[in-house]
């Protein structure tokens, strides 16, 4: 009996390994998971690129306002049967215009204007979606927390177009945007189109948020925009390195988060966000420890 068991042990181990490996490969063979992986990776890549500039320009709060301001646009677009991307983009542009209008026409500071618009648009969006939910049986959670596993081929096509537009802008205007990001006064002095750069960048932020919403929803989209960029700033010594690092971190976390969500039957959006946050805190503690050790050696 013992000899027979020892003889079969390698075969049993091989069977368990092959079964586990086939379970691991199963998500990549399903069409809806393939679309989910592509959308998630594109969203993470764009968030890493755009988020790096957001962090350096200190526009984190504005991006949060834009992400929550798209809700009314989503609700209205859904009601009239038009593509959600157009409603979300229009709502985000209107929110930015209103923020700038309040800031320039009153003594209120930008953060106050952002808070007012953020709360107003988000409240209106929740109200409209709640009404639509009763009439059309739409799940509110899909808007708030994303529905990456319900992505269609049309969503994939729209996302690919957005990716091409954003990459084209950053490739063609990278030097100008870099100059404006680090020194707006010098950029204005040398005659760079400041208004064009700022307006176009905010529109691209809105497009990135719309893409990311499919992956993790309105509530958590700020984490995907900010956390990889913040992690890149911790270890990056140049803008190019920060963009590269944040993009790699975002893509890796998106891939692993979706894979874990399928294997353990947990929501993909929160899983992606938690992984990115975990990586940030681990690197933060490591770098902090190194800095404190270096400082202690100096005295």
UniProtKB/Swiss-Prot annotation:
Family annotation (Pfam families): ABC-3
A GO cellular component entry from the record: cyanelle membrane
Keywords (A to Z) from UniProt: Cyanelle, Membrane, Plastid, Transmembrane, Transmembrane helix
SUPFAM superfamilies: ABC transporter involved in vitamin B12 uptake, BtuC
GO biological process, one term: response to zinc ion
Keyword RNA-binding: no
Cited InterPro entries: ABC_BtuC-like, ABC_TroCD
Membrane spanning stretches: 13-33, 36-56, 79-99, 112-132, 151-171, 201-221, 241-261, 267-287
Entry keyword Transmembrane: yes
Protein's cellular compartments: Plastid, Cyanelle membrane
Superkingdom per UniProt: Eukaryota
Membrane topology: Multi-pass membrane protein
Family: Belongs to the ABC-3 integral membrane protein family.
Name this polypeptide is given: Uncharacterized membrane protein in ycf23-apcF intergenic region
Organism in which the protein naturally occurs: Cyanophora paradoxa
Lineage: Eukaryota, Glaucocystophyceae, Cyanophoraceae, Cyanophora
């Amino acid at each position: 009996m013992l000899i027979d068991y020892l003889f079969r042990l390698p075969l049993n181990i091989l069977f368990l390994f092959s079964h586990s490996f086939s379970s691991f490969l199963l998500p990549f063979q399903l069409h809806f998971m393939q679309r989910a992986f592509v959308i998630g990776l594109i969203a993470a890549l764009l968030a890493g690129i755009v988020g790096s500039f957001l962090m350096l320009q200190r526009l984190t709060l504005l991006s949060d306002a834009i992400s929550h301001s798209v809700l009314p646009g989503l609700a209205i677009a859904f009601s009239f049967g038009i593509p959600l991307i157009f409603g979300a983009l229009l709502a985000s542009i209107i929110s930015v215009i209103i923020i700038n209008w309040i800031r320039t026409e009153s003594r209120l500071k930008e953060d106050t204007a952002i808070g007012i618009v953020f709360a107003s648009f988000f409240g209106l969006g929740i109200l409209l979606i709640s009404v639509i939910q009763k009439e059309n049986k739409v799940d509110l959670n899909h808007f708030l927390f994303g529905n990456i596993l319900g992505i269609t081929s049309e969503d994939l096509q729209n996302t690919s177009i957005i990716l091409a537009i954003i990459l084209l802008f950053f490739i063609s205007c990278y030097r100008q945007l870099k100059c404006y990001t680090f020194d707006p006064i010098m950029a204005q002095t040398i005659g760079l189109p400041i208004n064009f750069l700022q307006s176009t960048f905010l529109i691209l932020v809105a497009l990135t948020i719309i893409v990311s919403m499919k992956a993790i929803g309105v509530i958590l989209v700020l984490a995907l925009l900010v956390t990889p960029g913040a992690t890149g700033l911790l270890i990056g010594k140049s803008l190019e390195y920060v963009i590269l690092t944040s993009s790699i971190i975002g893509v890796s976390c998106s891939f692993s988060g979706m894979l874990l969500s399928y294997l353990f039957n947990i929501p993909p959006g929160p899983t992606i966000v938690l992984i990115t946050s975990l990586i940030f805190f681990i690197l933060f503690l490591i770098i902090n420890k190194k800095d404190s050790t270096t400082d202690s050696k100096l005295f």
